[in-house]
Amino acid sequence: MKQILNILPMFIFFIFYKFYDIFIASGSLIVISGLICIIHWIFYNEIDKISLFSFLSVFFFGSLTIFFHNSQFIKWKITIIYIIFSLVLLISQFFTRKPMIQRFLEKDIKISNIYWRKINFIWSLFFLFCAILNIYIAYYFSETIWVNFKVFGFTSLTFFLILITSIYINCKISKNK
C-alpha cells in the first residue's frame, strides 16, 4: 500500500496535465502529495522521510511553478531530487559503515557488505544518469514529451534497474547458500 501511495502523485500529475496544463497539474501534485503525508500519518502513525521530502520538494517547486507561471521549476524538481538521492547514496558509500541501500533492505535480504556497496554505487550512478537525462529531455524536447517521459520513461528505467538488482541479489543469495 505504501508503494502505491508513493507513486500515485506522479499519475495524478499526468492525468491533470493531459486534461488541463502543467500549472493545474503542479497544483494537483502539491495537493495529492500533502494528502499522502496525511494518509501516512493516519494509517501508519508516521510520515516516512521520503514522503516528507517528496512533499516539501513538490510544494516548493510546484509553488514556484504556479506563482511565476514558469514550468522550468517543476522540471528541475526531479533533477534536484535525483541529484540529492545520488549524493546521499554516494556519501553513504564512502563515509559510513553501511551503504544507504543496505540500511533500507538488510532486514529482508542477507548478502555480503561488498555486494551492498556495489548495488549502492550502481543506484547512485543511476540517479545521476536520470538527473542528467531529465535536464536533456526538459530542454531539448517538448513539454508533453517531458511529462510522458517523466511518468513512463523514468518509471520504466527504475523498474528495469529494480529487476536487474533483484536478479543480482538473488544470484548472490544463491551463492551464499
Swiss-Prot record:
One GO cellular component, as annotated: plasma membrane
Keyword Acetylation: no
Keyword Cytoplasm: no
Main location: membrane
Annotated localization: Cell inner membrane
Keywords of the record: Cell inner membrane, Cell membrane, Membrane, Transmembrane, Transmembrane helix
Coiled coil: none
Family label: Belongs to the YciB family.
Protein role: Plays a role in cell envelope biogenesis, maintenance of cell envelope integrity and membrane homeostasis.
UniProt protein name: Inner membrane-spanning protein YciB
Encoding gene (name): yciB
